[in-house]
Amino acid sequence: MIRPASWRAARRTLASASPRSIPISATASLFCAVFPPAFDGIGIADSWFWDGCENGIGEIVRSAIDTLARAGAAVKEKPLPEAREAFAVFSEGGVSAIELRAFLDRELPDWLATIDPVNVPALNNAETLSAREYLTRRFRLREAAKSAAARFDDVDVIATPTVMITPPVMTEDEGPERFWARNRAIVHNLVPGNYLVLCAATLPVGLDRLGMPVGLQLIAKGGDDERLVMIACAAERVLGTPREILGAPAMCKD
């Protein structure tokens, strides 16, 4: 099980050697030492996760991966083609809308009138979704998840940008179509982790050209949550903490 953020925050208060202040050769030894036994390395995701990155996001994430490689992590290209199928199912409506609609109809019918307008079309479409289509989507996801699990036979994690775009400015008069178009862009690299029954951690690794945070996502096989946390913590020791990389939030500065 992934430990809560408070655990990680407390963990960083413990005294430890900083690999950013010692020779790179020693850094490599430390980096290897803090990883779990038999660490298989980091895979770099295929172009589906990178094409369309805005404002230098892709370059910043690749630079972070290069830093981990120089520190001793084994790195190689690792495609995850099942991500395309997962995102296709998501774009078709996924399975959550019909499951939510069924739950509301059964347990909280009065809540239907209070649903946010941007979510109304999805719930209305779910009302007419056939059982055959729902089961077909579940089958497609199950087969894709089974295939995706095998991609981790020779790597522990697959690295991608967390979000490919700079956070958009949201407006109050934004309609459902524009909202969902932006939403799809925001969750593009996140959907595969959920739909393929994987787990993931994200680390801030810099600021894009508009000064917004950029994340490095490390995706691991489902059930490898503890191992993923260990790897993410090791990567953070090399790359730096969020405060070291991003600085203090503007509203938190004295």
Name every feature range the model reports, one short phrase each.
Residues 149, 180-204:
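Small-aliphatic-rich amphipathic alpha-helix that forms the alpha element of a beta-alpha
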Residues 1-51, 62-71, 135, 146, ...:
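Structural helix-boundary/capping segments
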Residues 39-41, 76, 94-146, 161, ...:
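Short helix-loop capping/hinge segments that flank enzyme active sites or metal/cofactor-binding pockets
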Residues 74-89, 123-124:
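Short connector loops at secondary-structure junctions
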Residues 5, 156-158:
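Short, Asp-centered acidic motifs that coordinate Mg2+ and/or phosphate
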Residues 91, 135-136, 167-187:
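Short, surface-exposed loop/helix-turn segments at secondary-structure junctions
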Residues 51, 166-167:
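Short glycine-rich, flexible loops that bind phosphorylated cofactors or substrates
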